[in-house]
Design a protein with these regions (language model features):
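A short helix-coil junction within the Rossmann-fold of NAD(P)-dependent oxidoreductases
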Residues: 38, 65-74, 113
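Conserved mid-core segment of classical short-chain dehydrogenase/reductases
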Residues: 34-49, 92-95
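The beta1-alpha1 cofactor-binding region of Rossmann-like NAD(H)/NADP(H)-dependent oxidoreductases
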Residues: 5-16, 45
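Active-site-adjacent segment of SDR/Rossmann-fold oxidoreductases
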Residues: 88, 109-120
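Residue(s) in the substrate-gating loop at a strand-loop-helix junction
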Residues: 83
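Active-site helix of classical SDR
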Residues: 63, 99
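C-terminal helical subdomain
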Residues: 123, 131, 135-174
């Protein structure tokens, strides 16, 4: 495996890297941007645009660039790093959640589109992972990068299309059919209590 440093919002850079990696059999889309931005009270749309450009459009660009190479090499696999917030939205990271929900939809869509060429497409959903991006989030449980990586490669090896990397993520996914009953009321109560405490 060869890690590649790349701005995935740079179309020319993506094309250049794809041209250098013609023997690829596994693409891991791990680039991400998290701005901790709400929808309405954010000062501008800049954070939302940055998150969508990287987390959705950048991931899409990588998949488009590498899909033909994977096909030429027997199918291979694409891994998209998603999030528990693919499944629900909070206020503090609302626009990030929207970008990850879009990336989840993208992942499910390209899985269908690339099935005929034999490409496995894996979506990895996790809560906070103990990386620099999650450093501002304190007093919350975090997954180790090693645990998420191990689960991801086990899934690729087994041909599984989804990884739910921690108990929180598994619980939220299981509650999706009752999200307005089970997921959002506790979030709303937390926000309401925080507002009362700050007044």
């Amino acid at each position: 495996m060869t890690p590649v440093g790349l701005d995935i919002t740079d179309a020319e850079g993506v094309a250049q890297v794809a041209g250098q990696c013609t023997d690829v059999s596994l693409l891991v889309n791990n680039a991400g941007v998290l701005k901790y931005s709400p929808f309405i009270s954010a000062p501008s749309l800049d954070a939302a645009r940055a998150e969508m450009e990287t987390n959705y459009f950048g991931t899409l660009s990588m998949c488009r660039a590498f899909a033909p190479l994977l096909a030429a090499n027997g199918g291979g696999a694409i891994v998209n790093m998603l999030s528990v917030t693919s499944f629900y939205t909070n206020v503090i990271d609302a626009s990030y959640a929207a970008s990850k929900a879009a990336a989840w939809s993208l992942t499910n869509g390209i899985r269908l589109e690339l099935h005929p060429q034999g490409t496995l497409v894996v979506g990895v959903h996790a809560g906070f992972i103990d990386t620099d991006m999650a450093a501002p989030a304190t007093n919350v449980p975090k997954d180790s990068p090693e645990s998420v990586a191990e689960q991801t490669f086990d899934a690729v090896e087994a041909g599984q299309v989804e990884v739910l990397a921690d108990e929180r993520t598994r619980t939220v996914k299981a509650q999706l059919s009752r999200d307005q009953e089970l997921i959002y009321p506790p979030i709303q109560k937390f926000l309401d209590d925080a507002l009362k405490g700050g007044s």
